[in-house]
């Protein structure tokens, strides 16, 4: 009956998914599972449940739901116009990444670039990284990451070299306080937009310097950062955090809105093995094969059968927050041993406490393999 009605109305669809109309949770569960952005129904209870689950929901106007205050449309054309407008209202994104550091950055960059229907990617800025054991200086790391970004974009047939900017050549904790292309671009983009999301998957140096140079951006940006460890852990000697602790302090001491995805015991749950990657991505594209190759031997940790693909967590959080559980806390202080000290200050920040590994990887494989 539904198919016949859709065909008679000339309504095009990719998939037809039927749910139990008597189960008010059924549509919300399916929307979350399939990462559906917008839902429409004429049932107030179904719409209300979808709204409770963070799904953008429209009520089709009927005589029996006219007393509800849920946003509604009266005609299918109105819904079409709403969806068209919604799709054009993409979130402005800056990705701050140390792309050549490990294999997870390449996965995250690919994942982001495969979701341009959701995001307006304003810039990709190169975060600093270095390794004494590999004799890689920050300056060399900048070049390696910059070239890696361009290589991945070329595989995806994207010419966005004008959106890639080199960043800091040292860390604030080493006395570095210079502006650079990345810092200047972060400020420029933040000031021109009403809202910009900065996705940090490396040391937070560029972002901290931008806040320090132009405090006006504080109320115009939101930071989503992978760094540190879970609340209550003995220390934060995690790579992104320990590279530039002074930069973390600058961000914490500002009033900027920030969500932190901790590594130990939270994002570490994204561990996966090489066989699962091969089963889902092998031979889907030249880029997918490269990602598998980098996963197997990232040139730093040596050959490994399984790893955590850390950085995809930040992209996934922006795609669907329903895959995560969070906790809002008073912004902690950072002790000398890098551990967090609880406070009662009024500044609140958000910590991710749990994630749905399976849903994240299901979406990553689907998008990356397209």
Explain the meaning of each model-derived region:
Residues 13-17, 56-62, 120-122, 218-225:
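Short hydrophobic/aromatic-enriched beta-strand-loop microsegments
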Residues 2-38:
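Substrate-recognition "cap/lid" segment bordering the active-site pocket of phosphatases
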Residues 24-33, 43-89:
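Asp-based, Mg2+/Mn2+-dependent phosphohydrolase catalytic module
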Residues 89-92, 104-121, 239-250, 254-370:
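Conformational coupling and interaction surfaces
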Residues 1, 19-20, 40-43, 98, ...:
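Short His-Asn-centered micro-motif
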Residues 7, 51, 252:
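Anion (oxyanion) recognition and catalysis
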Residues 90-134, 139-140, 171-274, 356:
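Active-site histidine-anchored catalytic micro-motif
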Residues 135-192, 346-357, 365-369:
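Metal-dependent C-N hydrolase catalytic cores
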């Amino acid at each position: 009956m539904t198919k016949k009605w859709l065909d008679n109305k000339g309504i095009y669809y990719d998939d037809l998914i039927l749910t139990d109309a008597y189960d008010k949770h059924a549509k919300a569960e399916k929307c979350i599972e399939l990462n559906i952005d917008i839902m429409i129904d004429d049932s107030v209870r179904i719409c209300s449940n979808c709204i409770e689950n963070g799904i953008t929901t429209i009520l089709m106007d009927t005589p029996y739901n006219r007393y509800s205050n849920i946003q509604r449309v009266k005609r299918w054309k109105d819904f079409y116009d709403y969806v068209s407008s919604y799709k054009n209202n993409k979130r402005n994104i800056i990705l701050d990444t140390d792309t050549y550091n490990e294999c997870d950055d390449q996965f995250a960059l690919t994942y982001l670039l495969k979701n341009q229907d959701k995001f307006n990617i304003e810039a990709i800025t190169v975060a600093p990284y270095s390794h004494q054991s590999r004799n890689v200086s920050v300056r060399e790391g900048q070049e390696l990451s910059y070239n890696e970004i361009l290589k991945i974009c070329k595989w995806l047939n994207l010419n966005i070299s004008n959106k890639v900017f080199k960043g800091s050549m040292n860390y604030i904790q080493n006395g570095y306080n210079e502006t650079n292309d990345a810092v200047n671009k972060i400020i420029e983009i933040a000031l021109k937009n009403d809202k910009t999301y900065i996705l940090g998957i490396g040391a937070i140096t560029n972002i901290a310097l931008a806040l320090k140079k132009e405090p006006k951006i504080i109320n115009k940006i939101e930071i989503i950062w992978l760094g540190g460890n879970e609340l209550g852990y003995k220390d934060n000697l995690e790579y992104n955090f320990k590279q530039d602790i002074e930069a973390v302090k600058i961000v914490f001491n500002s009033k900027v809105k920030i969500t932190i995805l901790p590594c130990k015991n939270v994002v570490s749950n994204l561990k996966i093995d090489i066989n699962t990657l091969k089963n889902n991505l092998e031979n889907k594209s030249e880029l997918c094969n490269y990602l598998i190759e980098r996963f197997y031997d990232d040139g730093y940790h040596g050959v490994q059968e399984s790893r955590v693909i850390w950085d995809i967590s930040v992209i996934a959080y922006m795609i669907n927050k329903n895959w995560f559980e969070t906790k809002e806390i008073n912004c902690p202080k950072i002790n000398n041993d890098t551990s967090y000290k609880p406070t009662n200050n009024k500044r609140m920040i958000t910590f991710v406490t749990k994630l749905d590994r399976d849903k994240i990887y299901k979406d990553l494989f689907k998008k990356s393999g397209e």
